[in-house]
Amino acid sequence: MQAACWYVLLLLQPTVYLVTCANLTNGGKSELLKSGGSKSTLKHIWTESSKDLSISRLLSQTFRGKENDTDLDLRYDTPEPYSEQDLWDWLRNSTDLQEPRPRAKRRPIVKTGKFKKMFGWGDFHSNIKTVKLNLLITGKIVDHGNGTFSVYFRHNSTGQGNVSVSLVPPTKIVEFDLAQQTVIDAKDSKSFNCRIEYEKVDKATKNTLCNYDPSKTCYQEQTQSHVSWLCSKPFKVICIYISFYSTDYKLVQKVCPDYNYHSDTPYFPSG
C-alpha cells in the first residue's frame, strides 16, 4: 500500500514549484521507478527536435498511465512545431556562441633604421667636355645597414687629361694646389674612416678625328676605371672631390650629397 501527495505552490514569480512526497511500504518501490525509469523517458523527450518542450509535456509523458496515483491534472497544449529553417538557425546561433573569439591580427615586425636610402648611378654624375677631352664620371652610395657604406665610381674618358676623384670631409677646402688635395686634418680623420676596397683601370689608344680640326687625325687615349671605397662609422658627411687638369682646361669641384636624404639623423653644416 502506498500513498503519494503532490503540492503545487504558486508564488508571485511566474515560476511553478512542484513539491512531491511519497510514503513507501516495507519492501515496496516507487511506482515511478517501476514504470520504465525516468532516465530513458527523459532521453527520449530531449532528443525530439521537432516539438517544443515544456514542463507540462515533460510531466505528462513521465507519469503516463499513472492517473490513479495522482490527483494533479496537468493540461497539455500541443505546441506549435518548429520549421526546419528555425532548427538550423538555432544550431547556427548556438555554434556561434561557442566559437572562440578570433585573435587580433599581428602587425608584421618592421625593422626600422637598418637599411637607408641609397644614391644610384643617376643621382651623381659629372660630365666634362673640352676640345681635347670628353669625361664622364658617375657614382653611387650604398648603405649596408651594419655601420658601413660603400661608394662606387665609374670613370670613362676619351682624350688627354689628368683626372682625380677622391673622398674628403666637408671641411676640405676647394683649391687648385695639388699638394693640398690629399691632406686631411687630424680632427677630420677621427670622423672620416674610408679606405679603397677595389680599383681597376683599363686603357686603350686609338686614332680618331680631331675635335678642333676634323680634317686631321689625332691620337686619343680611352680610359675606363672602377673604384670603390668602404667607409665605416663614426662619420658625419662625406664629400666627393673631383680635380681635372689638361692643357686647356682646369677644374676643381667638391660635391657633398644631401645627408638629410641619406640618413635619419639631420646634418647641419657648420663653418
Swiss-Prot record:
Predominant subcellular localization, coarse grouping: secreted
Alphabetical keyword list: Glycoprotein, Secreted, Signal
Entry annotated with the keyword Cell membrane: no
Keyword Plastid included in the entry's annotation: no
GO CC, one annotated term: extracellular region
Transmembrane intervals: none
Molecular function terms, GO-annotated: signaling receptor binding
Family: Belongs to the neurexophilin family.
Name this protein carries in UniProt: Neurexophilin-1
Organism of derivation: Bos taurus
